[in-house]
Design a protein with these regions (language model features):
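Extracellular glycan-modifying ectodomains
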Residues: 1-371
Length: 371
């Protein structure tokens, strides 16, 4: 009998001891501000484990905070910047869901370390005078598996990728079923405010933000964090980013992009590809080898040969940085900055407007021929 009481007391003490640790994640998710323990809005709003939600971020959110670059956060090298984020009902970084031109891409298209008005979608929208929708981070397969774009397709889809990720772009159909399944579950969650709140809260609990921030601080204090930095610029990969690509690799990548063109054209949608040069590419003279990569010029030449529309950002970026001394990437981050976005939007807008006028002339000529 005495032993039973002792066991019960021990269990009670253990429960009381564990209670704060069990309740804290719930308190963190349900009561505290989402950005209390994060260094960027990205970590605050990004979906962690609830991959049944329709988008990569929590829907219908607004966050304004001071954040730092991904390569040297909470260090003397960090460049602090106040940014604003809005997400739409589907969990993508947009103020609304209107879509004439749709951008598919990675975190550069989302606008990491950029404020909402500086993102490519908003800058391009102002320059084009058309509604531009940011569908990022996402893939062409996610787009093809999303019902709302079947019902209301955009006029143009621009697929963009940072140079180092181009070789990883999935072929059409590679993740088709997964994209359709997530679209179905996401639609169901979006249809209910209660389900949306439950999904977001459960996901925030799974993040364990304070725990992860504490581990990161311990690692920075006692660990041996190695930074890739040359001449006071931080890089994500350094020299390996400027590796050589074989002709076989180049053709395989071109096959994937040509597949995007055919898949979108079969739906009556124009396809344009816009690569974004690596920081290591444009800043290659800062690296020890000073080697200038040739991957993007070779890829663009191959795509033009296949009559795949491609926008050349590299030439403009090289001119801005090398001839006009305009920095195109933050010191502490691998993503492009607002000046690079402005330049890319200008090139893309000019390309799309020229393309529009050509299509209009072709259509008029076709009508005349039929008459």
């Amino acid at each position: 009998m005495m032993e039973d009481k002792g066991v019960k007391k021990l269990l009670l003490k253990l429960t009381l001891l564990a209670l704060p640790f069990l309740l804290w994640p719930v308190l963190e998710a349900a009561v505290l501000p989402g950005n209390l323990f994060t260094f960027r809005v990205w970590e605050t709003l990004s979906v962690n484990s609830m991959r049944v939600m329709s988008g990569p971020f929590y829907p219908n959110m607004y966050v304004k905070m001071e954040e730092e670059g991904e390569l040297a956060p909470h260090t003397p090298f960090a460049e602090k910047r106040v940014v604003e984020w809005y997400t739409d009902p589907y969990g993508y970084r947009n103020r609304d869901t209107k879509t004439d031109v749709l951008l598919i891409g990675d975190s550069n298209i989302t606008g990491a370390k950029l404020s909402q008005e500086e993102t490519l979608a908003e800058v391009l929208e102002r320059q084009l005078g058309k509604d531009v929708y940011s569908f990022a981070p996402a893939t062409v397969n996610r787009f093809l598996g999303t019902r709302r774009f079947e019902e209301n397709p955009p006029e143009v889809v621009v697929v963009s990728s940072i140079e180092r990720r181009i070789a990883e772009l999935p072929a059409v159909g590679a993740t088709g079923m997964g994209a359709k399944l997530r679209d179905m579950t996401g639609t169901a969650i979006n249809s209910s405010k209660v389900l949306t709140w439950l999904a977001v809260t459960a996901d925030r609990i799974s993040k364990l933000a304070l725990y992860r921030r504490t581990l990161a601080q311990i690692d920075r204090t006692f660990g041996k964090k190695e930074y890739i930095a040359y001449q006071n610029e931080f890089f994500l990969e350094g020299e390996p980013a400027n590796r050589d690509f074989s002709e076989e690799e180049l053709k395989r990548i071109a096959d994937v992009l040509e597949g995007y063109k055919h898949a979108l054209e079969s739906r009556g949608i124009r396809f344009v590809f816009m690569p974004i040069p690596n920081k290591e590419n444009i800043y290659h003279q800062l690296l020890p080898s000073r080697k200038k990569p040739d991957f993007l010029p070779r890829l663009m030449a191959e795509l033009k040969q296949r009559q795949v529309d491609v926008v050349d950002t590299q030439s403009t970026f090289e001119n801005l940085y090398h001839n006009e001394n305009i920095p195109l990437y933050p010191v502490d981050d691998a993503h492009w900055n607002e000046k690079a976005v402005e330049a890319a939007a200008g090139i893309l807008a000019q390309y799309l407007q020229h393309d529009d006028s050509e299509h209009t002339r072709d259509a008029r000529q076709l009508v005349k021929n039929q008459e």
